[in-house]
């Protein structure tokens, strides 16, 4: 299991003048790879070079439904050539989730995109949010999505904070979908007065002694903190998460 940072965590420091130094600092914290929230205006080769130059692996790049609809096989070819393995869909709007009027259409579009991706050795994943855990029949909308699309068409990228704030047990859900989750987002949080607050991993309310063993089948665990907290900037939050996880994982 390798340790990565979803670089969205440091999104304020990814401008052309900052990106290389940001990646250098990410490597210095002890991260082995980064997951990109998109191509950031670069070509696949250009983004991969910047990542590799910092000593980091580029293993996963997020996509959205516009990308799925466009189904650009040239981009897929470029990503596959650079060693990317996974293309997580970052989120789906309500109308495209189970129970929404475009759910069946969405499943068809994902099947088409996934088939092209699979020909290139890429697997499409789905990154959940709390709204994906809304009830749908006897299960949740996330369950319904995974029931509609098998794991070789749509894998999982579970997010621990969103599972928790969505009202399910992260440990239980990680176990439930362990066989289709090669990448897992590790995110900590608190709930104060019904409001969610992000925290460095190990600083919130999540049960890491239960969560980390439940991640053992994953190839990558990926820290993400949407906004900094505790009076720390985003770099210090990411470093604090890395230090906690390196100790827990024996890295």
Residues covered by each model-derived region:
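Short, well-ordered alpha-helical microsegments
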Residues: 43-45, 72, 142, 208-209
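Active-site acidic/histidine proton-transfer and metal-coordination neighborhood
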Residues: 24, 33, 57, 65-156, ...
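Active-site-adjacent beta->alpha loops and helix N-cap segments on the catalytic face
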Residues: 40-50, 96-98, 102-103
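Active-site beta-loop-alpha junctions enriched in small/polar residues
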Residues: 6-10, 37-39, 62-66, 92-94, ...
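Short acidic, glycine/proline-enriched helix-loop-strand junctions
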Residues: 43-62, 122
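Histidine-acidic metal/acid-base catalytic patches
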Residues: 1-29, 52, 78-83, 136-155, ...
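Domain-start "cap" segments at the beginnings of catalytic or binding domains
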Residues: 35-40, 44, 51, 66, ...
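Generic beta-strand hydrophobic packing signal
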Residues: 34, 59-61, 184, 221
